[in-house]
Amino acid sequence: MVEQLTMVSLEEQLLLNSFEKVFMGAAGGGATLDITDVFSTYLYTGNSASQPINNGIDLSGEGGLVWIKWRSGNNAFGHSLHDTERGVTKELHSDSTPAQSTEDRISSFNSTGFSLTSNTETNLNANYYASWTFRKAPKFFDVVTYTGSGSAKTVAHSLGSAPGMIIIKNTSVADPWAVYHRANTAAPQTDYLVLNTSAATVDSAAWWNDTAPTSSVFTVGTDHSVNANGENY
């Protein structure tokens, strides 16, 4: 059985309203985008059999990311992240540091969401899960991959505006999750956060090269977590 989350708090509704304003005309003369076209929070119950999650997000045509978390039931599973750039079988865990692994949790990205396999971590019978789906869209969300060089470099993105938040994971080996946020400090390009720990902000030029992101690129420094030579991110 699949159910969609329909109740939101006042704060969440205000956030959705602000997103709707951002997307008005964001397509650059094409169809107007609504928040429901590019983002979904969806609750479902596992059935230990293949099942589609029809949340209305076009992942097969536009690309994006699916983030799944076990909520309650007989087991405690971690966060499971899959995106269209790395492929449906490649998984990352946002609460830990390992490299990506090959798993059979999601079988396909679809024009109306995604489909689950019978894998227990994301679809165990009578267990409850939450999924968050982000579709690629200008001024909202993008997923990019790159190979590190060991020297400070820029990485292109397709947002068309300076990103407010950047999350980077080394997919080749175990490394912390690097986080940039424009409201983190007075000079956020000089600082970093780590997604998988509770550590406070750290000042270091090795992560963002003390360079603010732009509407077309962001900059990474020389730290292994963001730019090791020959490793993938």
Please place each PLM-identified region on the residue numbering.
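Surface-exposed molecular-recognition determinants
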Residues: V2-Y233
